[in-house]
Swiss-Prot record:
InterPro entries: Kinase-like_dom_sf, Prot_kinase_dom. The lineage of its organism: Eukaryota, Amoebozoa, Evosea, Eumycetozoa, Dictyostelia. Residues 332-362, 533-550 have a biased composition (Low complexity). It comes from Dictyostelium discoideum. This is Probable serine/threonine-protein kinase DDB_G0277989. SMART domains: S_TKc. The keyword NADP does not apply.
């Protein structure tokens, strides 16, 4: 814009705009002379504005006051820069006419702009919400006695550390304005609507609504349910039931003290701790004596406790509660804190007496503790508890799983000494539970217990190590304590990884209830948890840290225990947490260098994807080397306990593993997968034993491999037989070792000893193509290919078919600097594509990623073509011969001679390779073959064009270009093969097109033959040249290249002329479409080699709009032929390019079939009336243009790649786009056909457009408010209304008398009555939505317009009382339930329009000073607050 708005500031862009009868507000981004960005709020007051001058001044006064960073450094307020005011002269005093307020600019946007990002993460997390909450509490505390903000909403908080902005609605506390209606509809507290006066709790309401909105937006699998309950309490309809700022601060400080060291992510924001410290340092968390703290209760076995954290996991009925603190103990603690602060000079006995007195006054009653007794002699109720809660049926599967996990820990000799200590576990038993056991303090609901049973595990969090070190001074945490904690975790994780179930190991890594505890030595009298008597010792809190155990003995003499992550279900996925992350519990605050070395080695080994047991063994070996040094440095610290356990662990493990104990982890080689590069889960151990060398290949859960069990003996015999081949360098199979405990197979092969000495040279991950020249790499490639072909020939003489089994290639650098091939058979049988991939593997190993090669030229192009050919042939072979298992109408036939021929044909530099053993056969059988239908074709070449794979499409496909030769006739074809994502079908349909339609100047070429089924489609063309796709011309990423547009229009022309015989995939001769560029080119190749554009209409529409029209093409064709559609949207959105292109205009204007359907609208905007309404000129006539909708689902698809409103979209949000298909298969969602795209009939939704055409069909005589036409452009739907000069809305009219008002009232009542008869209620009647026109005789006519939020009768009930609309004209029952009638809800909604009409008339009466008693009484009756007393229309 660059328009100077005020002072030195230029407008950069408009952010928001708002206007009502009193004022107009515009928010701009502006630039100063230095091009720095600022926010400018422009406020323009109307001539009849009711806002007094003091209120106008408060716009900048409050902001300026609280922007003082010296006085208020802790407030995150949008900082005031300066302001400008423009005055209007009046007789009595000067009023502000305009004002401009300049504030700082924050580029994070406001909270309302937060959207879902990539994969399963969101742009804001739970920790961010809590940090925002804490920052708002700091601001509210400062505002508590000064001002009320009155407009807390997402639009008012900036995302960039979070700043509160827009203090325009704020007011002084306890002033005359305390009952003024100001704020944003969705966030206005009910007490504002009642106009009975209010305090700062209305800001609590608005903040609660904002936090709930954010919580719902970021809600993930696990969240703290307590936060949701707290936010709902803040949104209570009664102001007296909402917590105060002081209560909220006290609650959040207690919550921080109790859960910040647990797995809750509430306080993960790095600045949250600073907010808590601010509260504590200023003693803001200490309540006054008469203020009761917030209590959110949890009911356990009929007893109530105050809860600070509750996580509800969404998997398999699993629940647990963290850190339950008994209400009585908490009251004692609060009273102790209060009394201690008020009476610092009293002695301990006086404090105890005060505590007891306060306890009698404030406690809700004693809590029985008998059910928590550990034994008959000792009463031990922990004041701090962790409750592991497993909801399951006693005797059921889940119950047995959870119980078996506990028994596993108790029976393990190793774990018995490492975990489950008396001081940790208080109780474990199955008891009745309540389905909904979390209630707020004021909840009176009585929920009967169910018959379901559960397992409770009560643990004492007083000894939690994370909490312990959090409250401990940094200097007291010594190196030996840190080492003992790390050693303890190493022993625990090894025992679970070696002998425990996988899902327990995964849960342990993810820290689900897995907790490390520090216990005082047994020689010391252990501090007991308090018993609820008159002499109870207060529970440690933020003001009394838990450090009593550290003061009585040296910290190094404490012991560690572990509570395992017991689960009532089996993990179905592997943990994403790495071992080095699990062990890193101290961050950067380590006190011993060995810990740094442990974490560094663990991180390196994590990358190798070695089994956890093997990683830990290496860690222990490194630790053992430092044994003497550590025992000398940290004497009498208990480290010898861990070293003794390490030695026992290593001895037992090596004794158990007869062969695998010999494994040297420094000698490991990974296997290669052709398409997925290096496989980190497939590898060999290379070991040495008795002067022989072995390769040990581990496999987990081998029974999952298809056909292995039933063919196991045959397969192993063949492996043994292969090892006798004299010339092939193969791994000699020795035996298979089975580990029953871990359900793992170890395949042992004997290898040449020299391989053991060159293992590091063999590692494929370290092979670099930059170490050799281009010629050297080609020489290496030749050598390896010769070896491989000769080996294949020998293998073929011993085995009927080499294609039934796949094998792994190992490439070794020998002593003479030559590379040699070694082989080992894969344990995955029946992989026919393995043979082809072996050639691809060699090329990939030698040349690396060809796409990243720096050198260019013909040789690189040919290498790329060859390897691409092998990869495509491998994929086709796998699908046809394996997945299909013979149930397909197409199949691949090939042998090693074919691969050799393609090698020489596509890589001419290898023509000097001589392989005499089969050289004489080459002329007779040189091509691989494909059978399509019942016809055989030679495969001349295979090409993968530039195409985008889309995993969401139901008919998404891989496109391959096949150059084929029909064996019977030697005819050559270009075949385009599409691979759908469906299971193979043997039945096929063959379509022959004897007379292809080339009537469009021979530009469009149809296929001559189509063979297809539900799974694959082969389309044959008699052309020879280069095939390109629309992606080759999609440089702007919007498919608006002129070649694409011309092809699109040509195809539409072909489509309308031949709707009955249309094929959806055709070729266009690029030389004829883009003849201007071709003719002007000096490139001889472009003129001599034909080029064709593959235009697939299915693919084009899918890429543009996400719509699959494959199964609904007839419906789609009818839509685009009869009315505006996405096709006309494409044309209209590209009208400038089309109008300037002779070919495009010739197609549209000179073809009747096109001209009647598609036309270009040149609409020029004359004036912008509102963000969605413009005065325009079209075809020399004036119109009102209004945006009445958008292709909403298409917009959503373009942004997210899927329709998130679909009920299964949670799969996308959870797993991300990459893993959606596999996730859907796991969740059984694959059968929902509508999931993959947008239904044709649903892509364009506009409720207003439907209503407008419905009204037009019911009216006998059209008027100037009737829609004349609509069109689509840039994915938006625009309606066009005729414009009549002299018309205006009622807010703009300047002269009305009493008779005019009566006439207007009559007309509007009649129109609302008509709407009611048609089943429509308007929902936004106001002066701005009523158009008036005065005739020459003085008469006036009015019409209701703008049906943007109108509703049909019978729609969802929640829409009836939606807060959409204009505040000040909405019926009060929208905001207050008690004002709603008891009758039929479907009739009450029309009374809302009556109320809005009454408010509109009241506005006009006041504006024109109408004193008619009759009219005023009539309007008063229309605006009665109770629905039963309002007039009917």
């Amino acid at each position: 814009m660059n328009e100077i708005i005020v002072g030195e500031y230029k407008i950069h862009s408009l952010l928001k705009s708002f206007a009502d009868k009193d004022e107009e507000r515009n928010v701009y981004i502006v630039l100063n002379k230095s091009n720095e960005k600022f926010i400018c709020k422009e406020i323009i007051y109307t001539q009849n504005s009711n806002i007094d001058n003091e209120k106008r001044k408060s716009e900048y006064i409050n902001l300026k006051k609280f922007s003082d960073t010296i006085k208020y450094p802790h407030l995150n307020i949008s900082k005031y820069i300066e302001h400008f005011i423009i005055l209007e002269n009046q007789q009595e005093k000067e009023k502000i006419k305009k004002q401009y307020i300049i504030t700082e600019f924050y580029d994070g946007g406001d909270l309302s702009s937060l959207k879902i990002t990539n994969k399963k993460c969101f742009s804001i997390k739970n920790g961010d919400i809590i940090y925002l909450f804490l920052k708002m509490l700091i601001i509210f505390k400062e505002f508590q006695t000064v001002i009320i903000h009155r407009d807390i909403k997402p639009d008012g908080s900036i995302v960039n550390d979070y700043y509160l902005c827009d203090l325009g609605s704020s007011t002084q506390v306890k002033t005359i304005n305390s009952s003024t209606l100001i704020g944003t509809n969705q966030y206005i507290a009910p007490d504002v609507i009642k106009r009975g006066g209010y305090t700062g709790t209305i800001d609590i309401y608005g903040l609660g609504k904002t936090l709930l909105l954010l919580l719902n937006r970021v809600q993930q699998n696990q969240y703290n349910k307590i936060n949701k309950i707290l936010f709902e309490m803040m949104c209570s309809n009664e102001s007296t039931e909402r917590p105060t700022v002081d209560q909220l601060i006290e609650f959040m400080v207690c919550q921080y003290d109790n859960i910040s060291f647990t797995e809750f992510d509430d306080f993960t924001h790095p600045l949250s701790k600073d907010c808590i410290e601010y509260f504590k340092n200023n003693k803001l968390n200490i309540l006054k004596k008469d203020v009761k703290p917030i209590q959110i209760k949890i009911k356990i076995k009929e007893k109530e406790y105050r809860a600070y954290g509750a996580i509800q996991a969404l998997l398999r009925n699993f629940y647990y509660i963290d850190n339950v603190i008994s209400i009585e103990d908490n009251n004692n603690n609060n009273n102790n804190n209060n009394n201690n602060n008020n009476n610092n000079n009293n002695n301990n006995n006086n404090n105890n007496n005060n505590n007891n007195n306060n306890n009698n006054n404030n406690s809700d009653g004693p809590i029985e503790v008998a059910e928590f007794e550990w034994n008959e002699n000792t009463d031990r109720l922990a004041s701090e508890l962790l409750l592991g809660h497993f909801k399951t049926e006693t005797g059921g599967k889940n119950y047995e799983i959870a119980n078996s996990h506990i028994e596993f820990v108790l029976k393990s000799e190793v774990l018995k000494s490492l975990s489950y200590h008396d001081e940790i576990v208080i109780d474990r038993q199955a008891t009745p539970i309540y389905d909904n056991f979390i209630n707020s303090d004021d909840s009176q609901a009585q929920i009967p217990p169910t018959s379901t049973k559960c397992i409770h595990i009560f643990s004492n969090h007083k000894y939690n190590f994370q909490k312990f070190i959090r409250d401990l001074p940094y200097g007291e945490l010594t190196g030996d304590v840190q080492l003992k904690a790390i050693f303890h975790l190493i022993l625990v994780i090894f025992e679970i990884a070696e002998n425990g179930p996988d899902f327990m190991y995964n849960a342990l890594l993810e820290k689900n209830m897995g907790t490390l505890f520090i216990i005082p030595p047994s020689s010391e009298t252990t501090p007991r948890p308090p018993t609820p008597t008159a002499t109870t010792t207060p529970t440690p809190t933020a003001t009394t840290p838990t450090t009593t155990t550290a003061t009585t003995t040296k910290l190094s003499q404490h012991n560690f225990k572990f509570l395992f992550p017991f689960r009532s279900y089996a993990f179905s996925h592997s943990s994403n947490t790495k071992l080095h992350i699990f062990l890193n519990i101290f961050g950067d605050h380590t006190k011993d260098g060995l810990i740094v070395d442990i974490l560094k080695l663990a991180k390196e080994l994590d990358k190798t994807k070695l089994p956890t047991v093997d990683i830990i063994l290496q860690l222990i070996k490194m630790i053992q080397k430092e044994k003497c040094k550590l025992l000398e440095t940290y004497s009498n610290s208990g480290l010898d306990f861990y070293f003794n356990n390490f030695e026992t662990l290593i001895f037992n493990y090596e004794l158990k593993e007869s062969l695998t104990k010999l494994i040297d982890k420094n000698k490991i080689i990974h296997c290669v997968d052709s398409l997925n590069q290096i496989l980190t889960t497939r590898y060999f151990y290379f070991v040495e034993n008795h002067y022989k060398c072995y390769a040990i290949e581990p496999y987990k859960s081998l029974e999952l491999i298809s056909s292995f069990n039933e063919n196991k003996n045959i397969y192993i015999r063949k492996l043994l037989h292969y090892s006798s081949f004299p010339s092939m360098k193969r791994f000699k199979y020795i035996q298979t070792y089975y580990d029953k405990v871990n359900n793992s197979h170890y395949f042992v092969f004997e290898i040449p000893k020299k391989l053991l000495n060159t293992t590091k040279k063999m590692e494929l991950t370290k092979q670099s193509s930059s170490t050799t020249t281009k010629i050297d790499r080609m020489k290496i490639f030749k050598n390896l290919i010769v070896q491989h072909l000769n080996n294949i020939q020998e293998l073929k003489t011993h085995l009927k078919s080499i294609y039934e089994y796949s094998f792994n290639l190992v490439i070794s650098l020998e002593d003479d600097n030559k590379f040699e091939l070694y082989y080992s058979n894969s344990v995955s049988p029946f992989s026919s594509d393995g043979f082809i991939r072996s050639f691809y593997d060699i090329g990939k190993w030698v040349f690396g990623n060809l796409n990243n090669q720096e050198e260019e030229g013909d040789q690189l192009v040919k290498m790329k073509s060859y390897f691409s050919f092998l990869r495509i042939l491998s994929e086709l072979s796998w699908f046809c011969n394996i997945l299909g298992s013979g149930n397909v109408h197409n199949s691949i036939v090939y042998n090693e001679l074919n691969i050799y021929y393609y090698l020489k044909m596509l890589l001419p530099l290898l023509n000097d390779i001589k392989i005499n053993v089969f050289h004489y056969q080459i002329q007779n059988d040189i091509f691989a073959k494909i059978i399509i239908g019942n016809t055989q074709y030679n495969i001349i070449n295979l090409i993968e064009p530039n195409h985008i794979d889309d995993p969401f499409s139901m008919v998404q496909y891989h496109l391959y270009i096949m150059e084929l030769e029909k064996i019977e006739t030697s005819d050559k074809f270009t075949c385009l093969r599409k691979q759908f994502n469906q299971r193979p079908q043997k039945q096929s349909k063959i379509f022959e097109i004897p007379n292809p339609n080339n009537s469009i100047d021979e530009i469009l070429i149809e296929p001559t033959l189509i063979v297809q089924d539900i799974n694959t489609s082969f389309q044959f063309f008699k052309v020879n040249g280069i095939i390109k796709t629309i992606e080759d011309f999609n440089q702007e990423k919007d498919y608006s290249n002129i070649i694409i547009l011309r092809s699109f229009l040509y195809f539409l022309q072909y489509l309308f002329k031949n709707p009955s015989k249309t094929t959806l995939l055709v070729l266009f001769d690029i030389r004829k479409i883009d003849f201007d560029n071709i003719n002007s080119s000096n490139d001889i190749d472009n003129e001599s080699i034909p080029q064709y554009l593959c235009f697939d209409f299915l693919y084009f529409i899918k890429q543009m709009y996400g719509i699959d029209i494959y199964f609904q093409f007839e419906d789609f064709l009818e839509i685009i032929s009869t009315r505006p559609s996405i096709v006309s949207n494409i044309i209209q959105s590209n009208k400038k390019k089309i109008l300037n292109d002779i070919i495009c205009m010739d197609i549209i204007e000179n073809d009747i079939s096109m001209k009647d359907v598609f036309y270009l609208l040149s609409v020029d905007i004359i004036k912008t009336i509102s963000p969605t309404v413009n005065l325009v000129i079209y075809d020399k006539r004036y119109y009102i243009q209004k945006e009445v909708g958008s292709i909403s689902k298409i917009r959503e698809w373009k942004k997210f790649g899927i329709i998130s409103s679909h009920p299964d979209a949670v799969v996308f949000l959870k797993y991300g786009k990459k893993d959606l298909k596999s996730a859907m298969l796991d969740n059984g969602k694959v059968n929902d056909e509508n999931y993959y795209g947008i239904a044709v009939e649903d892509y364009m939704k506009s409720n207003e457009l439907n209503i407008l055409y419905y009204l037009l069909s019911k009216q006998e005589e059209p008027d100037f408010t009737n829609i004349e036409r609509y069109y689509l452009e840039n994915d938006k739907i625009y309606a066009m209304f005729p414009y009549v000069n002299g018309s205006c809305n009622l807010s703009e009219i300047d002269n009305l008398n009493e008779m005019d008002l009566l006439n207007i009232l009559y007309q509007l009542c009649f129109q609302l009555h008509q709407l009611e008869n048609l089943g429509i209620f308007h929902r936004d009647v106001k002066p701005e939505n009523i158009i008036s026109l005065r005739y020459g005789n003085g008469g006036i006519v009015v019409f209701i317009v703008d049906f943007g939020i109108s509703q049909y009768k019978g729609k969802h009930l929640e829409n009836y009382y939606s807060r959409d609309g204009t505040f000040g004209y909405q019926a009060p029952e929208i905001y207050r339930e008690e004002l709603r009638g008891d009758g039929d809800i479907k009739t009450q909604k029309y009374k809302m329009d009556v109320f809005s009409l009454g408010c509109t008339m009241a506005f006009l009466i006041k504006k024109f000073n109408i004193t008619s008693t009759y009219l005023n009484d009539f309007i008063d009756n229309m605006t009665q607050p109770h629905v039963c007393k309002s007039f009917k229309k």
